C-alpha cells in the first residue's frame, strides 16, 4: 500500500475520532493528514516539500480552530463594562434606575444624579445591577 493512502486513511480516522472525543480539534489534524496524503499520491517525488507544505497548512488550520482558546470570555453584565448606555428614566433617590444598552434594558445604580436621556458609562457590576456614572458633558 502506498504511503499516501495510509495518510488519507489516517486523516479520516482522526476526523472520525472527533465524534468520539469532541473538542480536541482532531478535524484540523485530520484535514492536514488528508492533504498530505493526496499530495503524496499526486507527486510522490516531492515528499519532503509536501511535508513542509502540510506542516504550514496544519499550523494555519490549527490557528483557525484554536484561535481564541484561553481568552477571557465576558458573559452577562460584565461584557458591558466600559460601554455607554442611555438612562430611560430618572434615577430614584436610592440611586437605582434603568438604562438601555445594546437594545436591552438593565437595572443600574449610580451615585450621580441621572435623569432620563442622560448618557452613562458602565463602570462595574454589582449582583444583577450595572454600576454607572454620568458621562461628563452630557
From Swiss-Prot:
Organism superkingdom: Archaea
* Stored InterPro entries: Membrane_assoc_protease, NA-bd_OB-fold, NfeD-like_C
Q: What is its main location?
A: membrane
Q: How does it sit in the membrane?
A: Multi-pass membrane protein
Does the keyword Chloroplast feature in the UniProt annotation?
no
Q: Which UniProt keywords apply?
A: Cell membrane, Membrane, Transmembrane, Transmembrane helix
Where are its TM segments located?
1-21, 46-66
Transmembrane in keyword set: yes
Can you quote a single GO CC term? Answer: plasma membrane
- State its location(s): Cell membrane
Which protein are we looking at? Uncharacterized protein MJ0826
Give the source species. Methanocaldococcus jannaschii (strain ATCC 43067 / DSM 2661 / JAL-1 / JCM 10045 / NBRC 100440)
Q: Lineage of this protein's species?
A: Archaea, Methanobacteriati, Methanobacteriota, Methanomada group, Methanococci
Amino acid at each position: 500500500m502506498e504511503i499516501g493512502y495510509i495518510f488519507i486513511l489516517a486523516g479520516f480516522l482522526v476526523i472520525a475520532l472527533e465524534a468520539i472525543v469532541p473538542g480536541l480539534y482532531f478535524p484540523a489534524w485530520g484535514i492536514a493528514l488528508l492533504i498530505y496524503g493526496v499530495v503524496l499520491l499526486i507527486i510522490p517525488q516531492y515528499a519532503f516539500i509536501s511535508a513542509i507544505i502540510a506542516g504550514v497548512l496544519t499550523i494555519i488550520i490549527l490557528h483557525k480552530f484554536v484561535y481564541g482558546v484561553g481568552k477571557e470570555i465576558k458573559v452577562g453584565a460584565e461584557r458591558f463594562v466600559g460601554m455607554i448606555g442611555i438612562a430611560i428614566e430618572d434615577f430614584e433617590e436610592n440611586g437605582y434606575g434603568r438604562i438601555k444598552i445594546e437594545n436591552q434594558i438593565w437595572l443600574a445604580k449610580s451615585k450621580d444624579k441621572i435623569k432620563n436621556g442622560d448618557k452613562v458609562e458602565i463602570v462595574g457590576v454589582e449582583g444583577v445591577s450595572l454600576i454607572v456614572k454620568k458621562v461628563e458633558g452630557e
